[in-house]
Design a protein with these regions (language model features):
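An acidic-aromatic loop/edge-strand motif
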Residues: 1-46, 50, 54-57, 111, ...
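Glycine/proline-rich low-complexity spacer/linker segments in large multi-domain proteins
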Residues: 1-26, 103-112, 511-535, 691, ...
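Extended substrate-binding grooves/exosites of carbohydrate-active enzymes
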Residues: 6, 27, 120-446, 450-458, ...
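Surface beta-strand/loop "capping" patches
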Residues: 29-56, 420-460, 547-563, 677
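Beta-strand-rich binding/interaction modules
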Residues: 45-80, 444-479, 494, 504-514
């Protein structure tokens, strides 16, 4: 065995030794050495051309094409083609009314090459691909890539990924509505492509060219990005000494995979800059295979010293672009379509911008889609925790160098292929169809089909569900009317009459189910759903309204005051209020302790991986070490209870105050506690991680029920896999166990949440929808620990009631969080009510 390279890094944990199958194949002395299958479509016919090359001399060969049912379509004998030095024998079979191959309908013919001493069988997909009008067309249809980057990686076997492992990945990828894969950053095992042919994926096949790490050593002491770009290509990409090596790697990729219909784009490599070596690789590729498209993102990284040839590149590619930068490109009259070879970095809790990218992709023809980074976390399995969860190491945990820490934990699935919530988010964002509108008066439901090739009626069955204040009040099957069609990229309306109550928060959900057993997705498989808020006379949650009403009470509250505290005593409760912080230090209801420690105004969250740049600003502002001080506190006893008012400031240790709060607490005679505050923020400080209340409840309060977006975690920019409803679970089930601990488990757009246990219940209800998080881990613990197996639960149930959280985004390796998701309000109001009850 000859080692291919001495050193190499492609963005994930390095391994050694042989990791691909090595085999010896005994063949006849005279046989077919190689063949190249191409297809052409001519109206209602198609041609399947086979070019052959023999070892030594030609042998008698019969080429037969079968359809998927096993019927012979055509059979021919190759003839000599002396003008073709590479493949000097040709054959062609013409098919009338062919069934074409695409990612949604991966129809395959079988080609058999018979010689006296052996038989070779291959599968053929008839398809064409070309660029026109800055769009990519397959079989004459403009397509969008809903793609993902995929490394070959397994937590136990490393790079050695077998057939069943590959099949499992592709099964999951297909079930979550992807239609394309980029083989980052090298050609995959051969059976990967055969499975992609069969299951239906468009593939960008990438040659094993990468010099990202090496480029860092040639910046001549200037680490600025412009200097990096200017000098990146000098040592390798624009150095003629590397031309043969670069072309050789490209040639090996192209020649091996040339017969796979799933491959529609050849990629020259990754992050290697541009120069003469890649000009030659592209020219060779286009000469050898002009029917496919070419891609190379690093073409934009070159020096200004000379003109470069980009004529053999079919698209402009970029990584992690902002929507603004894409718009700038499209506004500049480009001559190539725009493709995002990597976007929406999926590291940890994220990504949070998938819906925004989807809307932009669909509304701009020149943007042909993209490929998420990336499929899986590259953790190394190291055994199990006592509770059975896996222990996974990442960069540096083996004391190796160099490494990128947990930057290899950047996938949509955990190392063992459990889905991240980001994968569920993608699945529903890229559902096959969407509701355009629902007209209550006419009872007509308008749908848009986002498929590229298939009529929705041939693919998806529809069901519906109507809920009111969290209770399902109607559901059923939606039949397609006679003659109804919904072709790709079109809209149509069908009838759906539902009963909508006059009062209550009502939602209509439309579910899309796989109509038959298609491409790994069994009949009934949920493809996605829509949720529509239904208008009625009073769309407020009626249960929430009732929680804001106090039951009549003849009891009163007495107040005892000291220099530091106010003690409020009611019929069945005692609350201790800290005059120095403007917060309750202790709460006891029906002889049950509600607070293990003083509640807090809370602005910190355990930084997500997507906060890794922003957290530097947060730490500089010392948001993780803040003090709360009340400057003036007063109270008033009324017939209905007690009102407490305080002027409160929040400041980091040794820095100036950045939040001024006008706080009003109202305690009713029944023991309900209502907070209403107005906040003014010093906008010199960075956006807030969050703002809200943090309560430390007894750990026995270990069950949570809520009306909001669930059941999985949800955030202001990451909630499309969730839906509104009433949900109930344990506190442990709320935790999303990311390999590197971080903020997780929040729920967005909630009306109320209730925790109970040990004979006591506490309900929090918002004047407006709020966010909450309930956990046995503190945000400090999640911030401090580097691995999930290092986490220790606290002795309380931690309940965070948030006015809002900063969005999630994908800034771990992408643009800054979009402005509309930043918690940077100059002022805001927040009101929430706490209602204790005996269980």
């Amino acid at each position: 065995m000859v080692r291919w390279q001495l050193h190499g890094r492609s963005g994930y944990v390095p391994h050694e030794r042989i990791f691909r199958d090595v085999y010896l194949l005994h063949r006849p002395e005279q046989c077919i050495e190689d063949y190249f299958i191409t297809t052409d479509i001519h109206g209602s016919t198609a041609g399947v051309a086979v070019r052959l090359r023999y070892y030594d001399s030609a042998v008698a060969t019969r080429i037969t094409l079968y359809d998927a049912a096993g019927t012979i379509v055509g059979s021919v004998t190759p003839v000599e083609a002396p003008d073709d030095a590479a493949f000097p024998y040709h054959a062609e079979i013409t098919i009338v009314d062919p069934t074409l191959w695409n990612a949604e309908q991966p129809y395959l013919y079988t080609l058999v090459l018979d010689t006296p001493c052996e038989t070779i069988t291959d599968r053929v997909g008839i398809r064409e691909v070309h660029v026109a009008n800055n769009q990519i067309y397959v079989n004459g249809q403009s397509i969008k890539f809903h793609g993902v980057n995929r490394h070959e990686s397994d937590p136990v076997t490393g790079y050695a990924v077998g057939f069943e492992q590959t099949k499992k990945d592709l099964l999951m990828i297909k079930k979550h509505n992807f239609n394309a894969i980029r083989t980052s950053h090298y050609p995959d095992v051969p059976y990967f492509y055969q499975l992609c042919d069969q299951y239906g994926f468009f593939v960008i096949d990438e040659a094993d060219n990468e010099s990202h790490g090496a480029s860092e050593y040639y910046c001549e002491g200037n680490e600025s990005w412009p200097n990096h770009v200017e000098n990146w290509n000098k040592p390798i990409a624009d150095n003629p000494e590397f031309t043969e090596a670069t072309v050789d790697r490209t040639r090996l990729c192209v020649e091996r995979d040339k017969n796979r219909p799933c491959v529609i784009i050849w990629s020259m490599g990754n992050e290697s800059a541009y120069g003469c070596t890649f000009e030659e690789a592209l020219a060779w590729t286009k000469s050898f295979d002009p029917r496919r498209l070419t891609h190379y993102e690093s073409a934009q990284y070159r020096s200004k010293n000379r003109k470069y040839d980009f004529s053999n590149i079919d698209m402009f590619s970029n990584m992690y672009p902002s929507l603004e930068s894409i718009q700038e490109y499209l506004d500049n009259e480009p001559d190539k379509p725009y493709i995002m070879c990597e976007y929406s970095h999926c590291m940890g809790n994220g990504p949070g911008d998938l819906e925004d990218y989807f809307q932009f992709i669909q509304s701009h023809d020149g943007l042909v889609g993209g490929f998420l980074w990336e499929w899986c976390d590259h953790g190394i399995y190291k055994g199990k925790m006592p509770d059975g969860r896996g222990i996974y190491y990442y960069g540096g945990d083996h004391n190796e160098w160099p490494h990128d820490g947990n930057f290899c934990m950047d996938g949509l699935v955990y190392p063992d292929r459990r889905p991240h919530t980001g994968l569920l988010e993608f699945k529903n964002v890229y559902r096959p169809a969407r509701v355009v509108k629902y007209d209550r008066e006419s009872g007509m439901l308008t749908l848009h089909n986002y498929m590229d090739f298939v009529d929705l009626t041939e693919y998806a069955a529809l069901t519906y569900q109507v809920s009111c204040d969290g209770e399902v009040i109607d559901n059923g099957f939606i039949p397609y009317p006679d003659g109804f069609t919904l072709p790709p990229h079109s809209e149509n309306a069908l009838p759906l009459a539902v009963h909508i109550p006059d009062k209550g928060k009502c939602f209509l959900k439309i579910f899309y189910h796989c109509d038959k057993d298609l491409s790994l997705r069994s009949e009934g498989h949920l493809l996605g759903f829509d949720e529509i808020l239904l208008e009625n006379e009073d769309s407020r949650n009626q249960k929430t309204l009732a929680m804001w009403s106090d039951a009549p009470s003849n009891s009163t509250i007495t107040v005892q005051e000291t220099d530091r505290h106010l003690t409020l005593c009611g019929k069945n409760f005692t609350y201790n209020f800290n005059k120095l912080t403007g917060l309750f230090a202790a709460m006891q209801y029906e002889d049950a302790v509600l607070l293990d420690k003083e509640m807090e105004f809370n602005i910190w969250r355990a930084p997500t991986d997507n906060d890794r740049k922003l957290k530097l600003d947060w730490l500089a502002a010392r948001y993780d070490h803040c003090m709360t001080n009340a400057y003036r506190t007063e109270y008033q006893v009324t017939d209905s209870g007690v009102t407490l008012r305080a002027k409160v400031g929040i400041a980091p240790i040794s820095l100036q105050k950045f939040l001024d709060l006008d706080v009003c607490w109202t305690v009713s005679n029944s023991g309900a506690v209502t907070l209403a505050l107005h906040a003014e923020r010093n906008t010199v400080f960075p956006e807030l991680p969050r703002f809200g209340l943090r309560l430390f409840l007894p750990k026995e309060m270990a069950r949570v029920s809520y009306f909001g977006m669930g059941p999985m975690e949800s955030y202001c920019d990451k909630h499309h896999a969730a839906s509104h409803g009433y949900f109930s679970s344990t506190i442990w089930q709320q935790h999303e166990d990311y390999i590197r601990p971080q903020e997780n488990g929040s729920h967005y757009d909630c009306d109320y949440v209730q925790l109970d246990g040990a004979g006591i219940k506490l309900t929090a209800v918002g004047a407006k929808p709020f966010c909450f998080n309930a956990s046995h881990y503190t945000q400090e613990e999640l911030t401090e620990k580097e691995h999930n197996y290092e986490l220790h639960p606290c002795d309380s149930t931690v309940l965070c009631l948030d006015y809002a959280q900063n969005g999630i985004g994908s800034a771990s390796c992408g643009p800054r969080l979009a402005e509309q998701y930043r918690l940077d309000d100059a002022s805001f109001d927040f009101s929430i009510r706490l209602i204790p009850e005996k269980a």
